Amino acid sequence: MKLVFRWFGEKHDTVTLEQIRQIPGVEGVVGALFDIPVGEVWPLEEIMKLKETVERAGLKLEVIESVNVHEDIKLGLPTRDRYIENYKETIRNLAKAGVKVVCYNFMPVFDWMRTDLHKKLPDGSETMEYDHSLIEGVTPDELIERVKEGSEGFVLPGWEWDRLEKLRETFELYKNVDEEKLFENLVYFLERVIPVCEECDVKLAIHPDDPPWSIFGLPRIITNKENIERLLKAVDSPYNGITLCMGSLGANPENNIPEMIRYFGKMGRIHFAHVRNLKFTGEKSFYETAHPSFCGSHDLFEVMKAFHDIGYEGYIRPDHGRLIWGEKARPGYGLYDRALGATYILGLWEAISKMKERYC
């Protein structure tokens, strides 16, 4: 296991590289270039600047999250080939900088979705919540305004405002795209990009839909074991893999996360993992909790044991954390709770390793 920590860059993050460097066991950061418009080539010069900044702090930059996929590719529009060529060139540039894994998603219009970015918990901490009944009661425009207000000026990953400017127009285009068509468009994209990944030794890791069900009638296609397996078989290359995000897949209690880790891990197709916990509050409703098992609805010991059992040597990062101890930061991405999550993950890994050494 290689423990990494998401970082949004000097311009966009309240957390510094110096602080990340002091978290025990963290080897590197998961970075991105947030000022490059979606669909444009990431210049090698800018990638190298990011790499040099990270390495000066004593950390590595081997995982990128995310190189966003242009909406024209998801929609299957005639312009998609131009954007696919740009994506391929970005992968080549990332490879030159030593990047090993690129996380991406194929969610239409919206990235991850929450209805409250500042839910107050009894202990005074703040967390993010998803209440499906609120989704059913608002328009997409109203929800965007709510997210803007709750972001407190931070640009949230996947919610870059330039992507949402043509919301109504984009929704209209998706009226002709069902789950099957979206899947076809994803396969079309991968059939052209994966050969470049193979040439450059860069692995693609698709992030599951968050949450793993349809919202506002938009199709969702990476939601469970069955449709993930279908995608991996459709483009059957070890470079076509997944980001095992237990918070996204785990929002559906029918998804058995340890089982999925063992299944896809034995196939060698888990290239990256996000580990976090959440608490179910009703059907299709939950809020995010601290990482320890007793705080949420998932057993983190069993999750980490599954990774250990398959001999996982890939990248893992603590995912969304609460805002605690008065911290003002991007919702889900403060320093303190994610640092606690990182040490909890590391502690579980050490305990599992030593249990096996002594008793197996």
From Swiss-Prot:
Pathway: Carbohydrate metabolism; pentose and glucuronate interconversion. Keywords: Iron, Lyase, Manganese. It holds the Pfam family UxuA. It comes from the Bacteria. Its cofactor is Fe(2+); Mn(2+). GO terms for biological process: D-glucuronate catabolic process. GO terms for molecular function: ferrous iron binding; manganese ion binding; mannonate dehydratase activity. It catalyses: D-mannonate = 2-dehydro-3-deoxy-D-gluconate + H2O. Its EC number is 4.2.1.8. Catalyzes the dehydration of D-mannonate. Belongs to the mannonate dehydratase family. This is Mannonate dehydratase. The lineage of its organism: Bacteria, Thermotogati, Thermotogota, Thermotogae, Thermotogales. The gene is uxuA.
